[in-house]
Amino acid sequence: MFNQKNFKIIKNKDIEINTYIDGEGPLVIMAHGWPESWYSWRHQITSLVKNGFKVAVPDMRGYGKTSKPTEIDAYNIMELTSDIIAIADEMKVDNFSLIGHDWGAPVAWNTSLYHPDRVNKVCGMSVPYVVSKMPPIETMKFLFKDVFFYMIYFQEEGRVEKELEQDMRKSLIAVY
């Protein structure tokens, strides 16, 4: 169903972004969340292509066949939004629509904020757009307080890796 020839590695500086590209028409870029991959969008890809759109669907930075930098700062929102812009640049389009799900939603919101001349439509699912004077992680801590929220959990360097790697089977069952 999804032809291997439709995958392209798109460069953003030293990052290689594995991207599924298909269709003809206005460009729609779709950013997945955690713990997902480009394949999470398979049903939307089929429908969008069938209805006259071109899609570019990456494995986001750190996932799948896309580069996985070890430095934490390589995953800051400016770097993630630059990956989206690199995809649009490679597609040679000035304007595109952007859909983000879960962790892809903040990437979509921020790409549209930092590049309003490029993003003509934006949709974020599962994570709403929040205006706050606090840094995003502080806003999340305030909103979720003592409730488990994975985005806060993942801020603790080393702890997550240790806990998830203890029992991979149990971790995968808990996640999915």
How should these model regions be labeled?
Residues F2-Q4, I17, L27, Y63-I99, ...:
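Flexible "cap/lid" subdomain of the alpha/beta-hydrolase fold that forms the substrate-access gate
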Residues Q4-N6, S37:
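A short helix-loop-beta-strand connector motif used in the catalytic cores of GNAT acetyltransferases and
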Residues N6-N12:
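Short acidic-hydrophobic surface loop/beta-edge motif
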Residues K11, V49, D89:
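Short polybasic/polar patches that bind polyanions
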Residues N12, M60, V127:
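Active-site donor-binding loop signature of nucleotide-sugar glycosyltransferases
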Residues N12-I21:
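A short loop-to-beta-strand scaffold at the N-terminal edge of the catalytic core in hydrolase folds
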